[in-house]
From Swiss-Prot:
Gene3D superfamilies: Aconitase, Domain 2, Aconitase, domain 3, Aconitase, domain 4. Substrate binds at Q96, D189, S190, H191, R472, R477, R605, S668, R669. The lineage of its organism: Eukaryota, Fungi, Dikarya, Ascomycota, Saccharomycotina. Monomer. Belongs to the aconitase/IPM isomerase family. GO terms for molecular function: 4 iron, 4 sulfur cluster binding; aconitate hydratase activity; double-stranded DNA binding; metal ion binding; mRNA binding; single-stranded DNA binding. This is Aconitate hydratase, mitochondrial. It catalyses: citrate = D-threo-isocitrate. The keyword Lyase applies.
Length: 777
C-alpha cells in the first residue's frame, strides 16, 4: 500500500520492466500518497466499459473508455457523441484559491457536513509577482491572510486537503500527487486538462459543478465528440512538445475543439515525456476542447515511479490492454495528423493563442504586421511549462550563451510550477544558472500568467513585445497593458528571445555575437525528463484535514470586503420576458477576461457584490467602440457597464447582453456568470458560447441563447428592446422567439436556440442549480 514520505523521491534503476505478478485486477491500491481512504477502482470502470461496449457494439477510443467507465448508470445512459448528456462520477475535485472561495461558499450554503468526493484546494492565484519569490510570497500571505484563513479552516471543517501558499500551481501539484491513468478529475480551472499527460481525463468546470460533485451528486457533461490527433515521427533540435499544441492551435483555431475531447495517438506519442504530454493537454483549453488526453504508456510509468507511485504504475499495467488503451479500430469524429519529424518551433500571438507562426517565418511576419521586434521580457514557467525537463533545457541554452559571455538582454523571469520543482532545480544548480543569467525567480505560483504581475519596466500604453511559455495571451492579460504584444512559445524559445532581444531571431539559422566579438550559433537545447537524483520535495506545504472536525469554526467577518456569504437567487417568475433593455452589444472577442477581469480583481473572488463591479468592463461596446461605456436605456446617460446593470436591477428591470462568437472563451471562472445574475441579468444571447461559460450561466439561473441565424446579431441595435417568447413552454430542443422592438420602425423576430436538457431547465426555474440541489435535500 502507498505511504507518504518527505524524503527525496528516487526513480528505480529500471522503471519500466517492473513485475506485475504481485498485483492482480482485484488488488487494492490507493489513489495517492496523501489519502488512505481513496482507492483506484479500475475493476468497476472496466465493468462499466464492457456494459457500454455490449450496448454500442463498436470499439471505443481511450477517452470514451474513461468517460463511460465513470458513468453513473451504464445500463441505461443514453450515449450519442455531441448529443447525449452523460451522468458521471468523478474520482476527485481540485480547486484553486481564486475559484475555491465561491465554490466553498456555495457548498456551505447547501448545508452538507463534509465533501462526498475527495477534494483539494490549492493556493496559487493570489500571489502577485513583484520582486521575487520569498518577498512576494510573504507579502501575499500578509495581504490575503483573511482568505487563506477562510480556505484553511473551511477545508479542515469539510474534509478537504489544503495546499498552502508557496506549494505551487494547482495543475503541477495534481500531476505530482493526484493524477493517475484512467481517472476522472474535475477542477475549477480551465487548464485542469494538464493531467491528461498522465492518462487521466481532467476537465475544467465552474464552481457550481464542483459543488455538485463535492455534494455527492453525479456530474453532467454533454457527450463530447472525439478529435484524434495522430502523431508520427520524433521531435529533434529546437522543437519541443509545446510546439505540437501551438501548431494544433493554428490548425483548429480557438473554437475548433469546442464540444470535443482531443485524444492523441500514433507512434509519436511514445517519443517524449509525460510532462511534455501535460504541456500539450494543458493548452488544449486554448482550442476550446473539453479536455485532452494521452493513452497510458512507458513515459507515464517513468513519471509515476519518479514521484513515488510505483504501485500505481504496476496496477495500471495490469489494466493497460483492457481499459487504459483505445480499442483497435476505434473511430474518431475528426483526425488531424502532425509529423514530428518536420515540426519546427512555433510562436503564437499576439493577442490570441491560435495565431501560429513557425520560427522560420517569424521575422517577415512580424515586420509585415508592425509587431515590435525588440523583446522586452522573456518569461518561463507557469502551469504549462515548469517541469524539470523544461527547466533543464532552458538552463542548457543559458549556459551555452554564458560560455560566450552573454546574459539576458530582456528582463527574464522564472515561475516554478511547484515547491518540488523549485527545490529540485535549486539542489541541481539550474536555479543558480537562471539567477546568474540575470533572471528573477518568482514564487511557486501563477504570477504573470494570470495578470498577477506588478510590471515596472514600461508605462501603460507603451507598445512592446513579451514572449512567454504560458498558455494564454489575450489583450492586457499578463500586465494590464493593452499595447503589450504577448507571444506564447516554448521555454526554449522564450529563453532564446531573452538572450537575443529580437523577435526575428531564429536559433536554427542565425548567429549571435559573443563578448569576444566573434559570431556563434547557440547549441540545440539539452535536458533530462526526470531528475537523476530524484525529486527533492522541499518544504512541506500540505495541510491534511483533521480527524476531529466538529470543533473547527469557519468565520467570515460581516464587514469583510473580501468574503461574503451568499444569498439565494430568486426563482423564475414563470412568465415570458417583455421589453428588456440591452445592457451592451459586445463586438468581437469577449473572453472571461473581458467579462470578469483577473489581476487586481482576484482579491474580491469571495465577495460577489464587490467583484461584480468589474462585470464586462473589458468588452467592446458595438455602439461606440469603447470599453466600459454604455448608454442607460431609460436616462440616456453614459456610465460603466456594472453601474448601468445595477441601475436597471435596482429599478426592477431585467436586461440582456448580446454577444459575438465563442462568447466566454478562456478561464473557467464562474464569476463571469455569477456577476450578471447578481446584477439582474436574465439572458445572454450570442452567436455561440464557449462550453464552460455556457454551463456556468445555466448553473446560475441565466438563459444562454444562440442566434439560429448568426446574421441576426448584426440587425440588433444597442437601443432596441427585446421580448423572449416561449419560456412558459420551454423544453429541450424547443426554440425561443426573440421579438425585437427597435426605437423606430416595426418589430421583428429572430429564432434562438439553446442546449438545455430537462434537469438544466429546473436550474433556470428554481433560480440556480444550487437552489435546485437544496430543494432535493
Amino acid at each position: 500500500m502507498l505511504s507518504a514520505s518527505r524524503t527525496a523521491l528516487r526513480a528505480p534503476r529500471s522503471v519500466r520492466g517492473l513485475a506485475t505478478a504481485s498485483l492482480t485486477k482485484d488488488s487494492q491500491v490507493n489513489q495517492n500518497l496523501l489519502e488512505s481512504h481513496s482507492f483506484i477502482n479500475y475493476k468497476k470502470h472496466l465493468e462499466n466499459v464492457e456494459i457500454v461496449k455490449s450496448r454500442l457494439n463498436r470499439p471505443l477510443t481511450y477517452a470514451e473508455k474513461l468517460l463511460y467507465g465513470h458513468l453513473d448508470d451504464p445500463h441505461n445512459q443514453e450515449i450519442e457523441r455531441g448529443v447525449s448528456y452523460l451522468k458521471l462520477r468523478p474520482d476527485r475535485v481540485a480547486c484553486q484559491d481564486a475559484t475555491a472561495q465561491m465554490a466553498i461558499l456555495q457548498f456551505m450554503s447547501a448545508g452538507i457536513p463534509q465533501v462526498a468526493t475527495p477534494s483539494t484546494v490549492h493556493c496559487d492565484h493570489l500571489i502577485q509577482a513583484q520582486v521575487g519569490g520569498p518577498k512576494d510570497l510573504a507579502r501575499a500571505i500578509d495581504l490575503n491572510k483573511e482568505v487563506y484563513d477562510f480556505l484553511s479552516t473551511a477545508c479542515a471543517k469539510y474534509n478537504l486537503g489544503f495546499w498552502k501558499p508557496g506549494s505551487g500551481i494547482i495543475h503541477q501539484i495534481v500531476l505530482e500527487n493526484y493524477a493517475f491513468p484512467g481517472a476522472l478529475l474535475i477542477g475549477t480551472d480551465s487548464h485542469t486538462p494538464n493531467a491528461g499527460g498522465l492518462g487521466q481525463l481532467a476537465i475544467g468546470v465552474g464552481g457550481a459543478d464542483a459543488v455538485d460533485v463535492m455534494s455527492g451528486l453525479p456530474w453532467e457533461l454533454k457527450a463530447p465528440k472525439i478529435i484524434g490527433v495522430k502523431l508520427t515521427g520524433k521531435m529533434s533540435g529546437w522543437t519541443s512538445p509545446k510546439d505540437i499544441i501551438l501548431k494544433l492551435a493554428g490548425i483548429t483555431t480557438v473554437k475548433g475543439g469546442t464540444g470535443s475531447i482531443v485524444e492523441y495517438f500514433g507512434s509519436g506519442v511514445d517519443t517524449f515525456s509525460c510532462t511534455g504530454m501535460g504541456t500539450i493537454c494543458n493548452m488544449g483549453a486554448e482550442i476550446g476542447a473539453t479536455t485532452s488526453v494521452f493513452p497510458f504508456n512507458d513515459s507515464m510509468v517513468d513519471y509515476l515511479n519518479a514521484t513515488g507511485r510505483s504501485e500505481i504504475a504496476q496496477f495500471a499495467q495490469v489494466y493497460k490492454k483492457d481499459f487504459l488503451s483505445a480499442d483497435e479500430g476505434a473511430e474518431y469524429d475528426q483526425v488531424i495528423e502532425i509529423d514530428l519529424n518536420t515540426l519546427e518551433p512555433h510562436i503564437n500571438g499576439p493577442f490570441t493563442p491560435d495565431l501560429a507562426t513557425p520560427v522560420s517565418k517569424m521575422k517577415e511576419t512580424a515586420i509585415a504586421n508592425g509587431w515590435p521586434l525588440e523583446v522586452k521580457v522573456g518569461l518561463i514557467g507557469s502551469c504549462t511549462n515548469s517541469s524539470y525537463e523544461d527547466m533543464t533545457r532552458a538552463a542548457s541554452i543559458i549556459k551555452d550563451a554564458g560560455a560566450h559571455g552573454l546574459k539576458s538582454k530582456a528582463l527574464y523571469t522564472v515561475s516554478p510550477g511547484s515547491e518540488q520543482v523549485r527545490a529540485t532545480i535549486a539542489r541541481d544548480g539550474q536555479l543558480k544558472t537562471f539567477e546568474d543569467f540575470g533572471g528573477v525567480v518568482m514564487a511557486n505560483a501563477c504570477g504573470p500568467c494570470i495578470g498577477q504581475w506588478d510590471r515596472q519596466d514600461i508605462k501603460k500604453g507603451d507598445k512592446n513585445t513579451i514572449v512567454s511559455s504560458f498558455n494564454r495571451n489575450f489583450t492586457a492579460r499578463n500586465d494590464g497593458n493593452p499595447a503589450t504584444h504577448a507571444f506564447v512559445a516554448s521555454p526554449e524559445m522564450a529563453t532564446v528571445y531573452a538572450i537575443s532581444g529580437d523577435l526575428g531571431f531564429n536559433p536554427i539559422t542565425d548567429t549571435l555575437v559573443g563578448a569576444d566579438g566573434k559570431e556563434f550559433k547557440l547549441k540545440e537545447p539539452q535536458g533530462v525528463g526526470l531528475p537523476p537524483d530524484g525529486y527533492d520535495p522541499g518544504e512541506n506545504t500540505y495541510q491534511a484535514p483533521p480527524e476531529d472536525r466538529a470543533s473547527v469554526e469557519v468565520v467570515i467577518s460581516p464587514t469583510s470586503d473580501r468574503l461574503q456569504k451568499l444569498s439565494p437567487f430568486k426563482p423564475w417568475d414563470g412568465k415570458d420576458a417583455e421589453r428588456l433593455p440591452i445592457l451592451i452589444k459586445a463586438v468581437g472577442k469577449t473572453t472571461t477576461d473581458h467579462i470578469s477581469m483577473a489581476g487586481p480583481w482576484l482579491k474580491y473572488r469571495g465577495h460577489l457584490e464587490n467583484i461584480s463591479n468589474n462585470y464586462m468592463i473589458g468588452a467592446i461596446n458595438a455602439e461606440n467602440g469603447k470599453a466600459n461605456e454604455v448608454r442607460n436605456h431609460y436616462t440616456g446617460k453614459y456610465d460603466g457597464v456594472p453601474q448601468t446593470a445595477a441601475a436597471y436591477r435596482d429599478a426592477g428591470h431585467k436586461w440582456v447582453v448580446i454577444g459575438d462568437e465563442n462568447f466566454g472563451e478562456g478561464s473557467s471562472r464562474e464569476h463571469a456568470a455569477l456577476e450578471p445574475r447578481f446584477l439582474g441579468g436574465f439572458a445572454i444571447i450570442t452567436k455561440s458560447f464557449a462550453r464552460i461559460h455556457e454551463t456556468n450561466l445555466k448553473k446560475q439561473g441565466l438563459l444562454p441563447l444562440n442566434f439560429k441565424n448568426p446574421a441576426d446579431y448584426d440587425k440588433i441595435n444597442f437601443d432596441d428592446e427585446v421580448d423572449l417568447i416561449g419560456l412558459t413552454t420551454l423544453a429541450p430542443g424547443k426554440d425561443v422567439i426573440l421579438r425585437v422592438h427597435p426605437k423606430e420602425g416595426e418589430a421583428w423576430e429572430a429564432v434562438l436556440t439553446h442546449t438545455f436538457n430537462s434537469e438544466q431547465l429546473e436550474w433556470f426555474k428554481h433560480g440556480s442549480a444550487l437552489n435546485f440541489i437544496k430543494s432535493k435535500y
